[in-house]
A protein has these predicted regions:
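Short, surface-exposed coil-to-beta transition loops
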Residues: 49-50, 107, 145-147
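Active-site Asp-x-Gly
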Residues: 73, 123-127, 163-166
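Protein kinase catalytic-loop region centered on the HRD/HxD motif
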Residues: 134-141
């Protein structure tokens, strides 16, 4: 199942690459994604934060870093890969959506499964963690756990935006 969403994401990345090659402002990208959705009868959602763009489909998310100046302060996708690797070593990987790097046309794209939030309230992610999980998250400086940055997988909290802030 994992490779299925990654394979589908890799097929969509050339389209994203074209859109990003001539658009540098979020509102232009959003407009192009809207036109793509109409043309292809798709429902791709475009979102952006301080350092990353996200292209969200029903079963996967593709992230790409764009604001390289702020990555040191706010974290980027490579930071998520490092956090996940440490979580794997410590047996906490189940807390995080696994992110996979895919290089295409000189740009690194990061693919993760779509995790759905159900009935999330802002800043209550910590209430859903065990003492050990909470300690690990705090020890590794994982912040910004509001309702857009976590969801539920197999009845357990799953963090989807987890760059550490040092």
């Amino acid at each position: 199942m994992r490779s299925d969403y990654i394979t589908r994401a890799k097929k969509f990345i050339p389209t994203i690459d074209i859109i990003l090659s001539y658009n540098h402002m979020p509102w232009d990208i959003e407009e192009d994604i809207h036109m793509f959705n109409q043309e292809k009868n798709r429902r791709v959602i475009f979102s952006h934060g301080l350092t990353r763009y996200a292209f969200i489909t029903s079963d996967y998310v593709i992230k790409v870093d764009y604001n390289l100046n702020d990555i040191e302060d706010f974290g980027g996708c490579e930071d998520e890969i490092e956090v996940y690797a440490q979580a794997e070593k410590d047996g906490m990987e189940y807390l995080f959506a696994k992110i996979t790097r895919y290089d295409y046309n000189g740009t690194s794209y990061y693919i993760m499964p779509r995790i759905y939030g159900i009935g999330c309230k802002d800043n209550d992610a910590y209430d859903w963690m065990t003492e050990d999980e909470l300690e690990w998250v705090q020890e590794h400086d994982i912040r910004d756990l509001h309702s857009l940055n976590y969801g539920w997988r197999k009845g357990h909290i799953c963090i989807i935006d987890y760059s550490a802030h040092g």
